[in-house]
């Protein structure tokens, strides 16, 4: 990257925008129901599902990425293991055919329709893990090469992530950015016995905990979603950059400070940045699953 590229993402947006993101999410901007219908009619493609899709995401705050990365709602079982929730599978009519779709309306009373279409971009729509009725346990599992020393010391590849291992989440730091914002891990979801890996990132954070418990200046709609989709301060998302599909990371490199904030999620491919503590709605065209 040339020195001129640094001018694209001014440094003064760093700490200020991070603080702004901590205290508030945003609402879906500028596209109403009529617009969504128009998009749907103009982008029909062969295959199952797809089209205009609203998803909750961590906010894209800098760089060329067009939108945030979609959240994965999570639950914690009785033993502390973290599970990504998969929507209910149903049959729908599409183009005269009956196809299966994983979709849950009014997810946990949040008013949100949670759908597998949130993840149908960057080729993920063709992954085995996006098969609606795939038999899998849905646990979030540690990946092969974690970026964090604590995770390397705790897990082998394929081990299920456990909330009890994130016990330093109020103080953890690794020299990048501010300590005490949360304790992270990387992993996979719905990817066992598959040639394609769905990468995920998890952070257990006192900031998310505060937002779920009524703190912070966010909308009621945003808070309901955070309460429904996070657990014990832990948040997860599909870790596929919405620009060119690379795998970003939180507190994995000092380069994040140059292009926005060391407290943001940074994609090393083209310097897109995401604020994991600013939860927003996005609208995009989900790609259809292959027939």
Where are these regions (language model features)?
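Short alpha-helical basic/polar micro-motif
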Residues: 16, 239, 265
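N-terminal pre-ligand scaffold of iron-sulfur
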Residues: 35, 39-240, 244-252, 291
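N-terminal secretory signal peptides and thylakoid transit peptides that target proteins
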Residues: 5-29
């Amino acid at each position: 990257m040339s020195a001129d590229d640094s001018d694209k993402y001014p440094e003064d947006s760093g700490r200020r925008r991070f603080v702004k993101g901590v205290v508030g999410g945003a609402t879906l901007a500028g596209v109403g129901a009529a617009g969504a219908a128009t998009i749907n009619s103009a982008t029909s493609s062969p295959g199952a599902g797809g089209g205009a899709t609203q998803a909750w995401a961590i906010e894209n705050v800098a760089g060329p990425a067009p939108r945030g990365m979609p959240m994965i709602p999570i639950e914690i079982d009785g033993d502390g293991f973290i599970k990504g929730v998969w929507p209910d599978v149903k049959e729908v009519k599409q183009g005269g055919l009956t196809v299966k779709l994983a979709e849950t309306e009014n997810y946990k009373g949040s008013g949100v329709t949670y759908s597998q279409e949130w993840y149908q971009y960057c080729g993920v729509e063709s992954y085995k893990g996006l098969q609606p009725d795939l038999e899998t346990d849905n646990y979030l599992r540690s990946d092969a090469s974690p970026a964090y020393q604590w995770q390397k010391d705790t897990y082998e590849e394929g081990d299920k992530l456990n909330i009890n291992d994130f016990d330093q989440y109020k103080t953890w730091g690794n020299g990048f950015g501010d300590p005490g914002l949360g304790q992270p891990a990387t992993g996979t979801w719905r990817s066992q016995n598959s040639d394609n890996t769905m990468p995920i990132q998890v952070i257990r954070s006192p900031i998310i905990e505060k937002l779920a418990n009524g703190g912070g200046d966010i909308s009621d709609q945003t808070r309901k979603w955070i309460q429904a989709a996070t657990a014990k301060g832990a948040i997860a998302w599909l870790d596929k950059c919405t620009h060119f599909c690379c795998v970003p990371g939180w507190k994995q490199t000092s380069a994040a400070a140059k292009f926005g904030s060391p407290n943001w999620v940074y994609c090393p491919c083209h310097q897109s940045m995401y604020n994991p503590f600013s939860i927003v709605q996005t609208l995009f065209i989900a790609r259809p699953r292959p027939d």
